[in-house]
From Swiss-Prot:
Descriptive protein name: UDP-N-acetylmuramoylalanine--D-glutamate ligase
HAMAP family, sorted: MurD
Listed InterPro entries: Mur-like_cat_sf, Mur_ligase_C_dom_sf, Mur_ligase_cen, MurD
GO BP of this protein: cell division; cell wall organization; peptidoglycan biosynthetic process; regulation of cell shape
Amino acid sequence: MLRRGGSASTLRRSRTSNLLLHSFPYRWDVTECAGAREKILIYGLGRSGRGVARFLAREGVRAEWHDAHPTAEDEALMQELGFLRGDPGGTYRTVVAAPGVPIDHADLLALSAGGAEIIGEVTLAARLRPHLPLVGVTGTAGKGGTTVLIAHLLRAQGLSALEGGNIDPPLLDVVDQAEVAVVELSSFQLERVPGLRLPVAVITNLGVDHLDRHRTVEAYHAAKLNITAGQEAEDVLVVPAGLEVRTRAQLRPFQPERLSLADGRELLPVADLPEGIHPANAAAAVLAAEALLTRLGRPVEPERLAAGLRSARPVAGRFETVARIGNVRFIEDSIATRTLAVEAALTRAVPPIAWLVGGRDKGADLVPLRAAAQGRVRRVIAFGEDGEKLARALGLPFETVPGTDGDTVMQAATRAGLEALGGPGGAGTVLLAPIGTSFDLFRDYKARGASFTRAARALVAGEVRA
């Protein structure tokens, strides 16, 4: 099995702590891996898998790879790193699987039966960098914004903190550049974190998502709660006030209407937050940053934390105003495919709203969205594979934009949204909070968001007739 060795080259201690934060019942020895006594397979070459490959190459560890549909970019990178294509039917000691590969995938089950240990990038990072403090963030909605904000607040306190994980960049791309890594953790990643102990963990909320993968809400929540499974009494778990969680860690409940430290001292009024910073994310981030500073023996300076909140900026592609025409605002929230995230977008957008809905339906709960849309949404603009189905289920006035070319469809949908609000002389919000995933028309949610942004800015510039 992978072993955690004791050489100075292997254990790069963070300047923040001499504590070994992760307790694993196995060891990782890079020299053993480099000596080819450890056979490793990287299963899946998405963003995470490529990060794993680059990391292992930097460590001098040879590995093989497998991907059912590798891109030309994937194959070029593997060739550059000197990694050979592996056989998923072969025998390996360790398989580092991409988050998108289900834990019950036939190949992974066969590899496990053959003696392989199946892990993910987070476990790999924790084993090879056991002295690097990791702050883990999960939740149904808000985890990306909270992750970025925690890292920002820690930097405001003078720490070299970087974010990674489910959010760009991959965690393994930042572990050697930071004193602290703040990690966004999806439910997929949290299925593969045996033995992970986080000094500080955050659960932003628990809703319903990814039932196509987890099958039940209970299984989805169980995966999320793995974030605290390895925590001990001196660790901290930040949760929304009222959320009941079984944990050995100290609970730090946050309330979105109050930006305060654990002792109740308020840092600044919620009204003073910059545009686009969600109060709940900010409240959770403050408590998480404070907890880590305390755990590391660093002073907590309220003035610097408050300054960090004031200087925070929203994450691109998360409820971002990308264009304006008069009193019409175009807001890009392409990542809003979870009920909680879409509901938050509908609540925050200035009405009347022209709501762009579409993509591939993944079974989101529409009941809360009907309530959030009442009196706020003027018209739904349906697009993509399941846009019309979603619009009909919402029971709101809608029109459908046909087509199979992503950019062309997005241009037409954005223009239709503007017209629904009365054209350039109207008022309100054209909101892309699509409910459906992007894979029907686009490579990913970022590509969909970028297409919407281009279309909106083209309308502003007069390049597309409104």
